[in-house]
Amino acid sequence: MSGGRGSSSGNPADQSEAAEPNQSSSSSSSSSSSRGRRTADRQQVDIQPASEEDVDLAEVLAYLLRRGQVRLVHGSGATGLQLVQSYSDSDEDSDGAWEGRLGDRYNPPVDTQPDTQEVDQSEIRTQILLATGCSTLKAQHSFTHMLTEVRPQTSQTQSTNAIYLSNDIDPCSFRSFLPNYVSHKDTYQQKAFCGVYSEDGNMFLSACQDQNIRLYDTTKGRFHLRQTVKARDVGWSVLDVCFTPDAQNVLYSSWSDYIHLCSIDGDSETHTALDLNPDERRFCVFSLAASTDGNEILGGANDGCLYVFDLEQNKRTLKIDAHEDDVNAVAFADSSSQLLFSGSDDALCKVWDRRTLREDRPQPVGQLAGHRDGITFIHSKGDARYLISNSKDQSIKLWDVRKFSPKEGLAASRLAVTQQNWDYRWQQVPQRALKRHKLTGDTSVMTYRGHGVLHTLVRCRFSPEFSTGQRFIYSGCSTGKIIIYDVLTGGVVSRLSGHDACVRDVSWHPYEDNIVSSSWDGAVRMWEHRQTHPLEEERERERDCQREKDL
């Protein structure tokens, strides 16, 4: 099901609709055309304002009760009854179902022995080992010796907290400097949807469901609110934000026909609406990216299309029929802005060449298949070779764009998507959705499991090159945690707990060792590293293990 535009309320029934409206799961009923599935789904679930409702609230409630998604219990209200969300399922997989409720503090499934065969033979392994000083690794040293080998800073733009390793330091010592405590935080009255650092790390941009976009000064270790911009033409929430390359403007999108450009330089605000002129009656851009020269804006939308808006010409220059379902994620492959990546609810990542894009012949350079469910986010390593994708199949995959998927891989992924019959926004993850064996034709380099993707389009990213050599992948999680993986081993190296609801977005400072998380509990938290005594760290690990067992 999908709800209409608007903010969530405290009503438990509203809480079951915990995602962007019309952001359908890739699990539509099987048919000959996924494009047809998306159209049919919209016709079935598009709930209009009260004056033209074609779905009665009583019918919706009856459906939820019948499906076991909500239940009535005795309460203290005027009616003596209270509506609460149910997390039991009547189907045969209920005993093995993974409950998506935050209160359960469940543990997402983790690969105890990740398959590293492909990544062990990949070029990214060599890149990371060189970047982290492992290629000339000598004898391991004590922790005290490692501290003495930390290199001094040479530029004012480089943080005193940045992590450096000389060639003879074990790269595993990176883990000793990972963020581990909250140094700053801000709290909103509604859900925080997304947040990102500027390219130089001097500003942090946050978007909330309260329609406010907040700009923070993050220079010299600060986290001070500098400016609040009231977003315009917002439906449901601001869903994505990004800086223009010169950091003088911000872009934001929502359920609207427009992408908005807002100046943040100086005291005045100038809002410019960029009309994408879509054909859909209900339209949304889920993901935004700006080209390196700042001239073009790339957007991925709920109509399955990629949009390119040229700021110099002040018009939409391209509309590419890209996917068979909602496009949830877009990204530029590198600073040339010539290669584009897109990810969709059809479970496919596609690679496009900007120089050959044509509306009348929308052919990707190649396609990457291996996910079993819709893709929620993609992030490029920045070298035009590697990217990662987050998915509703509860995994992240690492891809090499030089290894496209064969036809049988595309067919296997499409079939897997059509077999999904659950809604990630408000249902449990059925056990059958957590299959771990690779699909036929899966060309991914590595798969990472240990985080939850429920309720909304959870995001993941590579850690910065400057401070970590891009050794890690970090992700938000529907359990309210931040999960950090080792790119090369697939193992979870850190879990940061502190939020009371889904962490939708995460952003690592490009030069400092801190991460900012944006959560649906309304909190934005900055996580930094705090040095602790080795014995204290061991005790904390033991306490964490015990807490995990108790849950």
What residues fall within each predicted segment?
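Intrinsically disordered terminal extensions that flank WD40 beta-propeller domains
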Residues: S2-Q190, S198, E537-L551
